[in-house]
Amino acid sequence: VKLKREKPEFKNLKYKKIISYLSKMDNSRSDIALVSNKKILETGTSNLLFVKDQKFFTPKKDFYEGNTYKFFKRKIKKIIKKDILIKEIKNYDEILLVGSGKGVTSVRTIDEIKWKRKNLEKFKFLSKHYDLVINKCNTYRFN
């Protein structure tokens, strides 16, 4: 979707437009990418981490840094910030969605550009760290 947050530090800016796209799909199986000037910024529900040659990459700017993204920033020794161009996505081995609702999820395919994940190595690494923290949390039931 050709859309970016005008002030990425504020999560809710233009969120109604994002929700209108998300409401038309099964969010447990798919998401929308927010793209501006041929650069991918984030998804409708999550931040993005790209993996190539064992290194993590993230968009340089113009995206909202969610809490789960901030958690992983502390766990990953180095995340390289760069413009993630649509035409270069085929070069990445893994694409990971990170967000409060999803935790960490591995993108299997992007049909529109014929991208397919090459492995799950970094996904498994991040999932392990995330699950350790989440499983320590108390749960409360509200009736």
Kindly give the residue locations of the regions a language model identified:
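Helix-start/capping segments and mature chain N-termini
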Residues: 1-143
